[in-house]
């Protein structure tokens, strides 16, 4: 909560797990029919790990999903768009690195590609065609650039 405090990799992973856990709890509460509690849990998860401490990434997807399912569509879409920007920037960097020099980037490339795939599926499920349609093209573009021998 203190400005300027650096979060090392161990702390970042722990806080990523918090985001994911709060999001999954919110989705479980929604499935049980408790929208009010789901929304409370979602905001708690967003508040514990604000974007200025850690960018929204794969581990915030369930929080965005919960917001949309709770009727906070615009807020959820805003988080999705920020996640897409973060993942897109990272993938853009990776495709700029020659394939022979991408050693050590496999995990984060895979995580960010999975982020795109999961957002695409979630967007289709929720009827968010304004996100899904351009994302499908972007996903295919990155796939062809990162995995050219798989085509």
Predicted regions span which residues?
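C-terminal luminal/periplasmic domains and tails of membrane-associated envelope-modifying transferases
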Residues: 1-151
């Amino acid at each position: 909560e203190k400005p300027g405090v650096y979060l090392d990799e161990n702390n970042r992973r722990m806080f990523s797990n918090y985001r994911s856990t709060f999001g999954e709890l919110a989705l479980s509460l929604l499935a049980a029919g408790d929208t009010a509690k789901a929304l409370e849990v979602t905001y708690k998860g967003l508040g514990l790990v604000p974007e200025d401490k850690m960018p929204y990434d794969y581990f915030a997807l369930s929080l965005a999903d919960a917001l949309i399912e709770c009727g906070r569509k615009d807020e959820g879409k805003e988080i999705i768009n920020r996640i897409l920007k973060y993942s897109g920037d990272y993938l853009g960097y990776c495709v700029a690195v020659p394939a022979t020099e991408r050693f050590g980037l496999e995990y984060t490339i895979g995580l960010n590609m999975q982020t795109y795939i999961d957002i695409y599926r979630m967007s289709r499920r929720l009827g968010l065609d304004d996100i899904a349609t351009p994302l499908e093209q972007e996903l295919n573009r990155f796939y062809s650039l990162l995995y050219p021998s798989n085509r």
